[in-house]
Design a protein with these regions (language model features):
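Active-site-proximal alpha-helical scaffold in enzymes
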Residues: 162-180, 236-269
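Phosphopantetheine-dependent thiolation modules in NRPS/PKS and related acyl-activating systems
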Residues: 1-58
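Conserved small-residue
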Residues: 5, 9, 77-81, 97, ...
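Short acidic, glycine/serine/threonine-rich loops at helix termini
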Residues: 11, 87-91, 195-206, 246-249, ...
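Active-site nucleophile and cofactor-binding loops and adjacent substrate-binding regions
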Residues: 1-2, 97, 109, 157-160, ...
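ACP-dependent fatty acid/polyketide chain-elongation machinery
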Residues: 4, 41-153, 161, 170-173, ...
Length: 294
């Protein structure tokens, strides 16, 4: 929060790396630098330790020695996909970043009627003082039959589940693989997400079997694991704003430890209705002009 622009954050990272003794040049940072930083944070060996038995007051000692992992600590990102405000894929997203484009806009009417909830000035109960958001285009479009999901069930699925399914499929394709070849493999799925507000739009869906699974964050990563028969862990993580980074960190830990051979990791967040927007405004977390000033 102390660095409100990409340039300021970049300068901060450079300073931190210089303090660690890593040489930074004006050219693109090489993969050798990132590997040095990554390896410096991980002990090369794990020393054995003595554990005392607690059973029946036993004073016996258990010698537990852990051998250093023989697996490489280098991790390759071989595929990437995603949708973002005013960017339908990662290529356009990168162009927006490079150009410094502001992708925040007024809340579109097709998302919800902001005029019913907007009130300028101080926060008022049930109202929001901000009318801005980063809105995804076509977030409600989905081909359920492609994923062997019935249209009835798809209607009860939070858009976060649908979008993550699509993003995982496109990520594997982007890596140059047929997604179905991963069947039976130790591929883990890690996603940063939070409970959505989609089902609050329909009381009927809240009380249905489809709504029970369609709104569950634990089901969100399991969808792609089930569809592709992935045998690694499927874990949803909610640590607020850091959820996606924590998900990726967990995936890296799994790869280094050898518990998985590959991973799908990322994050998803969609506000389908006004509830979360209003709550955030009530907490004073939103900007009245749609721009960050911290």
């Amino acid at each position: 929060y102390s660095y409100s622009t990409l340039l300021a954050l970049s300068d901060h990272i450079k300073d931190e790396m210089k303090q660690q003794g890593v040489l930074i040049t004006d050219s693109t940072v090489s993969t050798d630098i990132s590997e040095k930083v990554f390896q410096s944070a991980i002990p090369k060996t794990v020393t054995g330790r003595q554990l005392t038995s607690w059973r029946k007051g036993s004073q016996g000692r258990v010698n537990q020695s852990t051998k250093p992992s023989s697996r490489s600590q280098s991790i390759a990102v071989v595929g990437m996909a995603g949708q973002f405000p005013e960017a339908g894929d990662v290529e356009v997203f990168w162009e927006n970043i490079a150009q410094g484009k502001n992708c925040i806009s007024e809340i579109p009417k097709k998302r919800w009627d902001i005029d019913k909830y907007y009130q300028k000035g101080e926060a008022v109960a049930g109202k929001t003082y901000s009318k801005w958001m980063g809105a995804l285009e076509g977030y409600d479009l989905f081909d359920p039959l492609f994923f062997n999901i019935s249209p009835i069930e798809a209607e009860s699925m939070d858009p976060q589940q649908r979008l993550f399914l699509e993003a995982c499929w496109h990520t594997i394709e982007h890596a140059g693989y047929n997604p179905h070849v991963l069947s039976g493999s130790k591929c883990g799925v890690y996603v940063g997400c939070a409970y959505g507000d989609y089902q609050m739009l329909s009381r009927e869906e809240q009380l249905s079997a489809q709504g029970f699974t369609g709104g569950s964050t634990s089901i969100l990563p399991a969808r792609i694991s089930y569809f592709l028969n992935l045998q690694g862990p499927c874990i949803s993580i909610d640590t607020a704003c850091s959820s996606s980074l924590v998900a990726i960190a967990n995936a890296c830990d799994g790869l280094v430890s050898g518990s998985i051979d590959s991973a799908l990791a990322g994050g998803i967040n969609v506000m389908a209705g006004p509830d979360m927007h209003i709550k955030a405004a009530q907490s004073g977390m939103l900007s009245p002009d749609g721009k960050c000033h911290t």
